[in-house]
Amino acid sequence: MHYSKLKDFPQNFLWGASTSAYQVEGAIDEDGKSPSIIDMYEHPSDVADFSVASDHYHRYKEDIALFAEMGLKAYRFSIAWTRILPNGTGKVNEKGIEFYNNVIDECSKYNIEPVVTMYHFDLPYCLEEKGGWLNRDTIEAFVEYAKVLFIHYGSKVKYWLTINEQNTMILHPGAIGLPKGGKLPSKKDLYQQNHHMMLAQAKVMKLFHNMVPEGKIGPALNLTAMYPATCNPNDAIAAHNWEVLRCWNFVDVCAFGKYHPLAWSYLKDRNIAPEIQDGDFETLKGANPDFIAMNYYSTATIAASKGDASDVAARAGDQQIMLGEQGVYRPSENPYVEKTQYGWVVDSVGFRYTLRKVYERYQLPILITENGIGANDTLEPDGCIHDQYRIDFIQKHLHQMRLAITDGVKMLGYCPWAAIDVVSTHQGYKKRYGFIYVDRDEFNLKELKRYKKDSFYWYKQVIEENGKNI
């Protein structure tokens, strides 16, 4: 749809950027922090691990001052469960409480709205040894952890995210790392874990609304629209299959308190449906998220299944993520979109399409919590980083977001990935996302000096203008 005039971004729009604890903080064994599953996973030997990362733990004041200089109105970061409750439950680590209090207070000092992710892939390893999310005890452990956060930070933090990319953890478990020994859970076990996460999330949202009545809370999922490869009706059915299984079922359980009927039929047919205990379906009802947080990177194009093993293939550029499932869907190429050097589809129009679908389905405000392009940035001798490709990527996505706002989609804010360079899970510091360059490579920490990229100055101007020239 074309418009004679585009709507402006809201005056209170949360222009921000994002990080996660394990990718930015470092200090993995300092001040009482215990190991998380991320710390204990088998890590590629040729890329940086998370032990130092970008050393945000020791440099948060410097970093947040830079975020303020860039003009950020919001900073989305995650809290490491292992810093707060090193044993998963029980005794609270006061050093951990103090650190995040300091981060939040530093944000407030610059009028930056903290947006807190409670769980970003990094389950305490001590809980994993007891079965992790497959163990129903982890549900109550998460509720206990959440209560500690709400007690200490509920009066300071308005916007909360429960679980980051639950759908990625369930559908592509190898994407966040391999357990020691390299064996991934079965599909049935993964969907049992998913059910327990859903229960934990519902309980925490209800607790939040009781303890922090003025706050806002939502799930943070990786959402994307699916295109059928052709106008063949079977391709359209396959695209809908994957859209439901990858996206809508995860949001439906949170927003509507029940499984999507197509997803439940799929789970039952394949004998991978979770075991349901008395009261589970009642627990899922009434979570009442206040908004949907959405991570968006690319779209997918889907063809009808051929019903054999050829339906499954590795996603281009990422061997950790398999696409396609026998009898459900198969991936297809889209000749109308570009790809990054890592094989990720670049589709800004698909961003608008996805926003329209999400808002139409759930009628809740949307907060973008990740969106960005990973690239091999180069630090020039004069200290400049010319990342025009990042400016182009974000500019196009912001324009499509403005079109979506004009379409009637209610947007809370935009927190792209990432505020500062972080450790990419599989490519280390070869693949960078930040507006701020961290001068280190895979194994040479150098001085970890910060440099402002060209995109830093560009985004600063966008924020100053409230996106009026996008």
Question: Over which residues does each language-model region extend?
Answer:
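Active-site region of glycoside hydrolase catalytic domains
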Residues: 2-44, 87-88, 97-470
